[in-house]
């Protein structure tokens, strides 16, 4: 009888250990898909620090974001961004 209880406890423990990584994976995917995490502001600088004043004025108004799923309206793809091993689109307006 004691052996049966011990074996049952071991089987239940094994099932619980296998179930925990699945729950953690679900929680990780939920946190990865948070809105707002898609868009990350980026500071962009181009060219020579002694560039023309016309170029400086046009770049001052340039706002860029690293986006996972493509650019929004009024934005255009201006390259790629890298955060760790992931690549994002650099979208500027």
UniProtKB/Swiss-Prot annotation:
GO terms for cellular component: extracellular space. The keyword Disulfide bond applies. Disulfide bonds join 64-92, 66-81, 71-91. Paneth cells of the small bowel. It comes from the Eukaryota. Keywords: Antibiotic, Antimicrobial, Defensin, Disulfide bond, Secreted, Signal. It is found in: Secreted. Residues 1-19 form the signal peptide. GO terms for biological process: defense response to bacterium. Probably contributes to the antimicrobial barrier function of the small bowel mucosa. Belongs to the alpha-defensin family. This is Alpha-defensin 15. It comes from Mus musculus.
